[in-house]
Amino acid sequence: MRRFLLPVIFVIAAVVYSSIVVVTEGTRGIMLRFNKVQRDADNKVVVYEPGLHFKVPLIDSIKVLDARIRTLDGSATRFVTVEKKDLLVDSYVKWKISDFGRFYTSTGGGDYAQAANLLSRKVNDRLRSEIGSRTIKDIVSGTRGELMEGAKKALSSGQDSTAELGIEVIDVRVKQINLPDEVSSSIYQRMRAERDAVAREHRSQGKEKAAFIQADVDRKVTLILANANKTAQELRGSGDAAAAKLYSDAFAQEPQFFTFVRSLKAYEASFANSDNIMILKPDSDFFRFMQAPKK
């Protein structure tokens, strides 16, 4: 009897064990019967909350789906602004499953890769619409917050809504905005040309101002030199006049001494060079101070 009882107990235990399903915290379970989604009386997909549940062995199965917030980190995508300028925008999306039944059916059985692909398309379509209505300046510095908020609202409602996928978008964020290499090079060349033009203009203005300053300095120098020469001429004239007056006064007071001094200077100048030749009579008046005084 015991020989037959043990297998029966083992089978019953196995059946009971295989009938128990544990849905852990942070997940939800969807009941599948013969791989078909089970629905309740209201035709809604049966979703199991975290806890202990039962199923029919070999007939029912549970598909466990993650109920936590997930992050879709997309690659940089090219978008066109209202100015017809290309931008490379790198963004990410925070999302979670809001309708587990719809998510399961719309993603081919809860395929997260397919869900990410579908969500990425919707996000890019929304960003394309938002960026296409703004300028580069608005996107880079002005209304980036409005852009992200607009994308989030559009993905939560309207034709771009992710509700049809059973997904709720929690947040949309733009990580980085860059220009394509060819556009960056073009803008760099244009900025360099503009800076070169400004530099040339500044240099031209500087040269013009330097020439003006130089001309003004030259004019002032010429005026100062002219005034100095005028003053020097006046002083020289005054000095010559004073010297002439002194000579005249001295001559008037001591005419003989004055004549003697002038003769000595004449001798000095005449005999300074040994090569000088003078043809004069010995009794010439030039030598009167070199002759013996008359008795």
From Swiss-Prot:
The keyword Transmembrane applies. Disulfide bonds: none annotated. The keyword Membrane applies. The chain crosses the membrane at residues 4-24. Belongs to the band 7/mec-2 family. HflC subfamily. HflC and HflK could regulate a protease. HflC and HflK may interact to form a multimeric complex. This is Protein HflC.
